[in-house]
Structures are given as structure tokens and as C-alpha cells.
Amino acid sequence: MSNTSYDTYRESVAGRADVEDTPELVAYYKELAALKTGALWTVANKIEPWQPKSESVPVLWRFRDLREHVLRSVDLVTPEKAGRRVVYLNNPGRQDVSAAVGWLYSGLQVMHPGEAASAHAHSSSALRFIMEGRGAYTIVDGHKMTLNANDFVLTPNGTWHEHGVSAEGTTCIWQDGLDIPLVNALEAGFYAVHPDLQQAVTHAVDDMPAIWGGKGLRPHDGNWSKPYSPLFKYEWAPTYEALVRHSKVTEGSPFDGVLMHYINPVTGGPVMPTIGASMQLLRPGEATRAHRHTGSFIYQVAKGSGYSIINGQRFDWTERDIFCVPSWAFHEHANASASDDAVLFCFNDLPVMQSLGLYREQALAENDGHQAVL
């Protein structure tokens, strides 16, 4: 005899479902279940919460803890066998979908000098943020980009792309960021391996940054109609310079310090339709106020050290550490140095939230905008 309860989510609030189980109703619910249907009022309060309830939890992944394990994978598997030699970040609340937070995937990939992964394409949008090493490169639809530390490169939905490290380089580690969980949730994922395993470089090396990377300039013959940025590679040096210059003439955001978004130079919008990226600078000693918003965010420390408080938990971070902020979680950041700035790279699903009209933001009102640490 089943003891299933159907009134678990009752709420004694006007306008909300508040139906108590009775023998007659339970029998009715079972009849509906046999027809592969159900009574909305038994689940309405669950599937339409008062506010977002993320299954993800805040996590800090320390690079000093992960690095040796990432490097060890080199001795255990080859790129040819693994496809992509990656240690992925698995949020305790999202292990069922292999997500780092929300619907975002992240992992650390390593390659030795002279290694190259096979060219492939997939429905997921992706980016790579270089953490250490020199000589890394990525080829996207025949465009080859050379990469240095703190550069990041796009490998958009549907593009042929591959990664490698030149024979003259050093062992490289980078962070992968993809929307795999989102694409799979939408049941829209495809994957393909290039028929030749490697693609030909059909354009001058670093041509796209050269064509599209001019500050405030657009090439006269620059025709681009694809839904993602043609820039492909976003370099650290000009990004950091822009942050520093901006910090000298503005107070910045009370919640994010000096925040700048990477953009598609054609549209001024996000770099890809489903993944946004940004870089923010915290001045020496700066501590932001807390706020929360819809959307999942993954941060990597590009420079400096400090801490973030996420839903009352303090996470101390330093360069190359990675941490996540789940949707609708209060968070604030602080630079621990009194003399040097700190810089955080971030990728997120903000474009999805905004394009679907789901973005909401709220500042913490009490305690002068700062959370109590639990």
C-alpha cells in the first residue's frame, strides 16, 4: 500500500495551492497518474517558487590543490585517447549534469609542448582562459590564435576548433567554459569529429584580432553576420590597461568595482548568445557591497588575492583560483592587498537571462550592504 503524500508543498497563503490530501483525492491522483497526468495544485508551489532556488552551492577550487592532479593526467591518458584531457569542476549540487554551477560546465585542460587535440565541433558554446604556460594556440574554422596567460579565446557553437601547444612552448593549463548542461537540458546537443582529425590553417595567424581588435574602430570591409564575436581572441594586456585607465576616472560599481564586459565588436552585445564574459578590478583594499541576481557566474582570479562572501560563506582566493556564485546568491568581493589591485575574470549565462527577460537584481539592504559571515 503506497503512503505517497501529495500535499507536501501546501502553503497557507492566498493565491497559492493549499489542498489537503483526502482518501478520495489520493484515489483521484492515482487515476491521473495512470493516465500519465497529474493535478497541478499538488506541485504548483514547488515548480513556481517565490524566488529562485538554486541547486548549486558556492564552491572554491584552489589551483594549488588541483594543479598536481591536472598535471598527473598527462601521464595517465593521451589526447588521442581522452579526446580532451580535462579535469572538470563538479558542483556538489549539480553532479547529475556535471556542472560547475547552474547550467555551466568548467574544467582544467592540460597539454604538453607538441601536443594537439583533434578538431571537433559541438552545439555547445565554449571559451578557453589560459592559466599558465606559453605556446598555446587554438584554431577556429581555419583561424589560428596564439595565446598567452590570462588571454581567452572563443570556440562558438558549431565551429570546427582544436587546441594545441607549439613544440617550442611549455606545458599549458587553461580553463574551459561551456554551456553543455544548458544545451543538454534543451535536448539540442550534437558533436562531430573533423574527418581529417586536424583542420588546415587557412588565414594569417591572429588575423581576427588584427582585423577586429582596433579600439573604437571597425574595418571598412568587415562583413560579419554570425551570432558570435568575430574577435575570437581577447588579450590580457589591453584588457588590464583598459581596467586601470577606467579605474582612474570612475568610482565603479558599488557591487563589482571596476567592471568591464567583453563584447562582440559588431553588435556591442555579449561575445556569444549563451555565454557572457567580463573582467573586473578591485582597487587596493576595496570591499564591494553585496547583491544578488539571476544567472550563474564562474570567476577565475587573474591577478591578486582577496576574498568573496557568498550567501554568508567566506572564500579566500588567490591567483588562478576558481569559484562560483549560484543564481540568486548574495555575494560581495574584497581585495586583501593594501597596495596592489586584484582582477577577476568571469564567464556566465547572463546573455540567456537577459534575452529571455529573466534577469533580476537585488541589493542587500541591511548592515550597510554587507553580509554577516556564518
What are these regions (language model features)?
Residues 144-147, 159-178, 313-318, 322-352, ...:
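Catalytic core of Fe(II)/2-oxoglutarate
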Residues 266-269, 275-279, 291-294, 304, ...:
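C-terminal structured domain segments across diverse proteins
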Residues 2-101, 199-274, 278, 369-374:
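A short, N-terminal "cap"/entry segment at the start of jelly-roll beta-barrel domains
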Residues 109, 127-129, 154, 168-188, ...:
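A short hydrophobic beta-strand segment most commonly corresponding to one strand
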Residues 112, 116-149, 155-159, 164, ...:
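A short beta-strand-loop-beta hairpin characteristic of the jelly-roll/cupin
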Residues 99-101, 118-121, 271-272, 290-291:
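Short loop/turn motifs at secondary-structure junctions and domain boundaries
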Residues 157-212:
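Contiguous mid-protein beta-loop-alpha structural module that forms a pocket-lining wall or clamp
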